[in-house]
C-alpha cells in the first residue's frame, strides 16, 4: 500500500507537469487532488493504520498535498499565459492596414451654391448680414414701400402667424434693418430662407432661398449695378453665358430690372427648367426707391443705392443642369450624394 501511494504521488507530479492545456490540468486535479483523489484516500485510511504510522502518513499526505497544489498553481499560470498569447496571436490586428471608410455627409447643393455666391460678393467688398425668418408686416411690406392693397400682402400669398407677423416672403427686410442701424456707405448681402404659398412645381417651392444685396453710397448709378451683377454672373456661370437686363417693376426700387441668363440646361433652346424660353430669370434689381430711404432716415438727396435679390435654388438648377427644383427637397440620397 505504501509503495502504491508513492507511485501515485510521482504519477500526479508527472501528469501536472505534462498537462498540455487547462482542461487536462483540471482533470489531473480532479483525479489526484479531488474528493475521490488518492490524497483523500490516504487521509481516510489513516484511522485504519497502525498507531505508529498514523503521524508519519498524516504529515506526508499534507506535504504531498502542498507540493502538488503548488505545482498545479504554477502550471495553471503557465497554461493561462500560453493560452492568452495564442489567442492574441490568432486575433492579431495589423494596425498598418487602412480602417473602414466611414460614409460622410455632404453639404447640400443649394448650400454649396449659396456659399459660392456669397464668396463672389465678399471678394467684391460686400459684408454678410442676416435677419429673422419670422418678420413683422412692417419690415416685410410697409418699410419696402409695398402698398397696403398689394396682392402679395394677402393671406393666400403669404404665411401669416397673426395679423402683424408672418414668415418672411423675401430677404429684403434685412436691408431695412441694416439701413436703420448702420450709416452709409453700405455694401451687404443677406442670404436666408423665405416662404410663400406657392404650389410646388418644376421652378417653385413654398420654402426657398434668397440672397439680398444692397449698396448705398454717394453717386451710386445704375451702370454700377449692371457692372457688379454682370461680373457676378460671369464669375458664377462663365463669361460665355449671355446676360440680359429687362425693365421691370418693384415697389422698393426705381428704376427696376430683371436679370436673365441663357439657360444652362438647354443652352437657349428651351426646356422645362426655363419654361421653354431659352433664358432664366436669376434675380430682380434696381435703384433703391427714395421713399425707402426716407422711411429708414437716409437722405435720398445725398445718397443713392441699388438693391438686388436672387434665388440660389434656381441658380443651382442652372449650375448643375437640374430641370426640377423639387429634386433638391425630396431628400433622395441617390440624388444628393452626387454633389
From Swiss-Prot:
One of its GO terms (cellular component) is cytoplasm. Pfam families: Phe_tRNA-synt_N, tRNA-synt_2d. It comes from the Bacteria. It catalyses: tRNA(Phe) + L-phenylalanine + ATP = L-phenylalanyl-tRNA(Phe) + AMP + diphosphate + H(+). SUPFAM superfamilies: Class II aaRS and biotin synthetases, tRNA-binding arm. Its cofactor is Mg(2+). GO terms for molecular function: ATP binding; magnesium ion binding; phenylalanine-tRNA ligase activity; tRNA binding. One of its GO terms (biological process) is phenylalanyl-tRNA aminoacylation. InterPro entries: aa-tRNA-synth_II, aa-tRNA-synth_II/BPL/LPL, Phe-tRNA-synth_IIc_asu, Phe-tRNA_ligase_II_N, Phe_tRNA_ligase_alpha1_bac, Phenylalanyl-tRNA_Synthase, tRNA-bd_arm. Its EC number is 6.1.1.20. Binds 2 magnesium ions per tetramer. Keywords: Aminoacyl-tRNA synthetase, ATP-binding, Cytoplasm, Ligase, Magnesium, Metal-binding, Nucleotide-binding, Protein biosynthesis. It is found in: Cytoplasm. NCBIfam families: pheS. This is Phenylalanine--tRNA ligase alpha subunit. It comes from Dictyoglomus turgidum (strain DSM 6724 / Z-1310).
Amino acid at each position: 500500500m505504501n509503495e502504491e501511494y508513492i507511485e501515485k504521488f510521482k504519477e500526479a507530479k508527472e501528469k501536472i507537469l505534462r498537462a498540455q492545456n487547462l482542461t487536462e490540468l483540471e482533470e489531473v486535479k480532479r483525479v489526484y487532488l479531488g474528493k475521490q483523489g488518492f490524497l483523500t484516500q490516504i487521509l481516510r485510511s489513516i484511522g485504519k493504520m497502525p498507531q505508529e504510522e498514523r503521524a508519519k502518513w498524516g504529515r506526508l499526505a499534507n506535504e504531498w498535498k502542498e507540493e502538488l497544489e503548488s505545482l498545479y498553481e504554477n502550471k495553471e499560470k503557465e497554461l493561462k499565459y500560453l493560452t492568452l498569447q495564442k489567442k492574441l496571436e490568432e486575433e492579431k490586428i495589423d494596425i498598418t492596414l487602412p480602417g473602414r471608410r466611414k460614409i460622410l455627409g455632404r453639404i447640400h447643393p443649394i448650400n454649396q451654391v449659396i456659399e459660392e455666391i456669397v464668396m463672389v460678393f465678399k471678394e467684391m467688398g460686400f459684408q454678410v448680414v442676416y435677419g429673422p425668418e419670422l418678420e413683422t408686416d412692417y419690415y416685410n411690406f410697409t418699410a419696402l414701400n409695398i402698398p397696403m392693397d398689394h396682392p402679395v400682402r394677402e393671406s393666400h400669398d403669404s404665411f401669416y402667424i397673426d395679423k402683424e407677423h408672418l414668415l418672411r416672403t423675401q430677404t429684403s427686410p434685412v436691408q431695412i434693418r441694416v439701413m436703420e442701424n448702420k450709416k452709409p456707405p453700405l455694401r451687404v448681402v443677406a442670404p436666408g430662407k423665405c416662404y410663400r404659398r406657392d404650389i410646388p412645381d418644376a421652378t417653385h417651392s413654398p420654402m426657398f432661398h434668397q440672397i439680398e444685396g444692397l449698396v448705398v453710397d454717394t453717386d451710386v448709378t445704375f451702370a454700377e449695378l449692371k457692372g457688379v451683377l454682370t461680373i457676378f454672373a460671369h464669375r458664377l456661370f462663365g463669361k460665355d453665358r449671355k446676360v440680359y437686363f429687362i425693365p421691370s417693376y418693384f415697389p422698393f426700387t426705381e428704376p427696376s430690372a430683371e436679370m436673365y441668363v441663357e439657360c444652362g440646361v438647354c443652352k437657349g433652346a428651351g426646356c422645362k427648367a426655363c419654361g421653354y424660353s431659352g433664358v432664366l430669370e436669376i434675380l430682380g434689381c434696381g435703384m433703391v426707391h427714395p421713399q425707402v430711404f426716407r422711411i429708414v432716415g437716409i437722405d435720398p438727396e445725398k445718397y443713392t443705392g441699388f438693391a438686388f435679390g436672387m434665388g440660389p435654388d434656381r441658380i443651382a438648377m442652372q449650375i448643375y443642369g437640374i430641370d426640377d427644383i423639387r429634386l433638391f427637397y425630396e431628400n433622395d440620397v441617390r440624388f444628393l450624394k452626387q454633389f
